[in-house]
């Protein structure tokens, strides 16, 4: 369980990185001294409720690694990640709590959607994983989401390659 912080309020940061570092061991170098790749070096930032954060930079600068830190998919080598004032640990329960509230939206919908899953399954999967609502409520939520982005109900039964790029973006 993450460390408790009972003083968190909705005005405080939802996600906070403090001096986050991620270092990967490379396959080059020797067995006892592998080369290291510094993917993220001393990143500190906060995101408050209702804010949207875009990470922009050149290829290989650490955007994806920083995003993975923020949504709990990557643990920092050093530094700390906080969610609603609680320090995130390395347990799956910590990541699940974060995953219910925070997500990444990828720029390219071709890579964001599983090409083997129909739109319905893509949309309902996170609701199933997090146990949100009853099965009937989940189905209603999926239909509501589709309506919200202006897609017809028939779009639920198609694979991503069967809809236009703009429609894929709206699904993603």
Regions found by a protein language model. Give the residues of each.
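Q-loop/switch helix immediately C-terminal to the Walker
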Residues: 108, 117-128
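Conserved ABC ATPase signature
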Residues: 159-163, 167
């Amino acid at each position: 369980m993450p460390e408790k912080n009972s003083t968190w309020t909705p005005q405080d940061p939802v996600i906070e990185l403090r001096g986050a570092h991620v270092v990967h061991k490379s396959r080059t170098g020797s067995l006892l001294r592998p080369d290291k790749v510094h993917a993220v070096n001393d990143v500190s930032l906060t995101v408050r409720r209702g804010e949207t954060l875009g990470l922009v930079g050149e290829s290989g600068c650490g955007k994806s690694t920083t995003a993975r830190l923020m949504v709990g998919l990557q643990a920092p080598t050093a530094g700390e990640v906080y969610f609603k004032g609680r320090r995130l640990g390395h347990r799956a329960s910590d990541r699940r709590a974060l995953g219910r509230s925070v997500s990444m939206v990828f720029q390219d919908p071709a890579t964001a959607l599983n090409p083997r899953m129909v739109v319905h399954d893509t949309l309902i999967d996170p609701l199933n994983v997090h146990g949100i609502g009853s099965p009937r409520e989940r189905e209603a939520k999926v239909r509501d989401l589709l309506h919200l982005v202006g897609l017809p109900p028939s779009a639920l039964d198609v694979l991503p390659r069967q809809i236009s790029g703009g429609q894929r973006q709206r699904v993603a």
